[in-house]
Amino acid sequence: MSDRLISATAQSEDNDLELSLRPRRLSEYIGQQKAKETISIFVEAARQRGEPLDHVLLFGPPGLGKTTLSNIIANEMAVNIRTTSGPAIERQGDLAAILTNLAPGDVLFIDEIHRLSKAVEEILYPAMEDFALDIVLGKGPGARSIRLDLPKFTLIGATTRAGMLASPLRDRFGIISRLEFYNNEDLTRIVTRAADILKVVIDRSGAEEIARRSRGTPRVANRLLKRVRDYAQVRAQGDITADVAAEALEFFEVDPLGLDHTDRRLLSSIIEKFNGGPVGLDTIAAAISEETDTVEDVLEPFLMQMGLITRTPRGRVVTPQAYKHLGIPMNRETQKGLEQNSLF
């Protein structure tokens, strides 16, 4: 699933592209106005006091710039950043090694922080609160605990699932900021900026066409731009207009709403096999041969955001907009069923 062209999850091909396109200062960061203004205030206040920034939790769907914003914070504070992830920190000793090698003021960025084990979380609490590391030496009755002082640092945690964070961990973040899906205007600016960096000739309408199909996600927008650039180079003398962008994205099976074959297959399966719903999550997953978690975490959020599918106590139901988008006519029985489902 992560290899889908419109997947918001990072892919191996994204690494070099994102590094070259990533803004380095808040002034260059497009969109997320509320989060940007909030962080700007806290960063400036910390700089004026000569103190490390308070711990920051960034949450929201993948691909919206949590890693980028973390690097910007480190740049604005003029400190180094150490990057890791929840799954990579398997033991308490792994985290202890990272913490003891931080310099005063450094930023420690932990992606997917909700995937830290409870054992690792336990030594993170005093590190965040008291800038100290509690280490147990020995085992059994003879075991003793020693406390090591740590340099004052800033922890930035990123997660797509804030609800999975343990309350004691979440409560230790002084700054909590949610990143939202981008609007088309901001995405158009992002595409235009990326095209300029990549030296791609693109007009305003071409950038708008790519933005419109990018699912509100900068990572997807940059990836689509790269693919459209290749298509334009071979089929359209290299220049990207609205017509060229639309032609390229249709070729890559990304429709005007940003849906791909997998999205459309999910919607059409509910319509054709279950008369539009309601239908359970496990049944949907089996019908399209996908994992339940993939349907719930990867496919559904965007379809719900676009108003193409809804959740009811009785199961998932497609909306009239989905029928219209897919060009599937609704019979009276289906229309009546959808009206009844909307009451629950």
Swiss-Prot record:
Location of region: Small ATPAse domain (RuvB-S): 183-253
Residues that, per the record, bind DNA: 311, 316
Keywords annotated in UniProt: ATP-binding, Cytoplasm, DNA damage, DNA recombination, DNA repair, DNA-binding, Hydrolase, Nucleotide-binding
Region of interest called Head domain (RuvB-H), as start-end residue ranges on this chain: 256-344
Main location: cytoplasm
SUPFAM superfamilies (alphabetical): P-loop containing nucleoside triphosphate hydrolases, Winged helix' DNA-binding domain
SMART domains in alphabetical order: AAA
Start and end residues of each stretch annotated as Large ATPase domain (RuvB-L): 1-182
Intracellular or extracellular location(s): Cytoplasm
Job of this protein: The RuvA-RuvB-RuvC complex processes Holliday junction (HJ) DNA during genetic recombination and DNA repair, while the RuvA-RuvB complex plays an important role in the rescue of blocked DNA replication forks via replication fork reversal (RFR). RuvA specifically binds to HJ cruciform DNA, conferring on it an open structure. The RuvB hexamer acts as an ATP-dependent pump, pulling dsDNA into and through the RuvAB complex. RuvB forms 2 homohexamers on either side of HJ DNA bound by 1 or 2 RuvA tetramers; 4 subunits per hexamer contact DNA at a time.
Subunit record text: Homohexamer. Forms an RuvA(8)-RuvB(12)-Holliday junction (HJ) complex. HJ DNA is sandwiched between 2 RuvA tetramers; dsDNA enters through RuvA and exits via RuvB. An RuvB hexamer assembles on each DNA strand where it exits the tetramer. Each RuvB hexamer is contacted by two RuvA subunits (via domain III) on 2 adjacent RuvB subunits; this complex drives branch migration. In the full resolvosome a probable DNA-RuvA(4)-RuvB(12)-RuvC(2) complex forms which resolves the HJ.
Family, per entry: Belongs to the RuvB family.
Record protein name field: Holliday junction branch migration complex subunit RuvB
Gene: ruvB
